[in-house]
């Protein structure tokens, strides 16, 4: 597939713009210009030139906005944003960094402009910003991704019945903090998720949070003034009973995993690194990848303390 747009692209683009400017002779045909810009954008996509496609979709969005077609304008803005982001992702994959972040800034601008076009209580507002945040996360711009994920949470407050989606966004934020090795902030977010999940009875979230909160507590070792949730959790795992632990509605933790976590807590209290290493192997069938990573961090943390 050819990636050369040739001189025809600039000629076509200029011709469309010139037709729009002929206001003294006749009223410009906005719908026709929109279609022409859209068709030119498709040609750019086929030629694998996403920045030029983004520019053309942006012009189409302006045309739709000029005739009061808010929805049409938003759709073209979103198409523009995706093309600019595609260009940025391609540069990132090639390890090419643009100091001016031209494509990325154009993408962010188009995403935010599209977001502003949708009604305040529309779920599409949240979807647009979520898409932007996810793209930023893929690019490794974690702080910016968190910023826009938090922006999503503000939008969710005005959209009915979105609590489950809010948990998903909070989960994404917590995951980024884990990637950044900011375990204190990750612990705070998982505590928020845990509280909400218990109210909503979202069992998968409850189990994930319980394991993560315990491991993060042991890694971070926060001050006694900030450990109310963790203290109650640790108390549950400190109690030794002759009865075998069982699954229940409030704490859907597998009995064997419960015993392993109990052993982890005791191993940390006694600085038994060998026991932690053995438990890490024994627990692998019960832990998600992020929790296995936390176990490795926990072992490293206590190795440096001995």
Regions found by a protein language model. Give the residues of each.
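Internal amphipathic alpha-helical repeat/solenoid segments
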Residues: 2-6, 15-76
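Residue signature of alpha-solenoid helical repeat architecture, marking inter-repeat boundaries
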Residues: 7-11, 28-31, 48-51, 71, ...
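TPR repeat positional signature
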Residues: 12, 16, 36-37, 50, ...
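Conserved small-residue packing positions in alpha-helical repeats and bundles
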Residues: 16-21, 41, 54, 61, ...
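Hydrophobic/aromatic side-chain positions at a characteristic register within alpha-helices
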Residues: 25, 45, 65, 99, ...
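TPR-repeat structural position
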Residues: 30, 50, 70, 104, ...
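Eukaryote-skewed repeat-based solenoidal scaffolds used as protein-protein interaction platforms
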Residues: 78-79, 87-205
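Structured C-terminal portions of repeat-based eukaryotic scaffold domains
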Residues: 149-154, 162-306
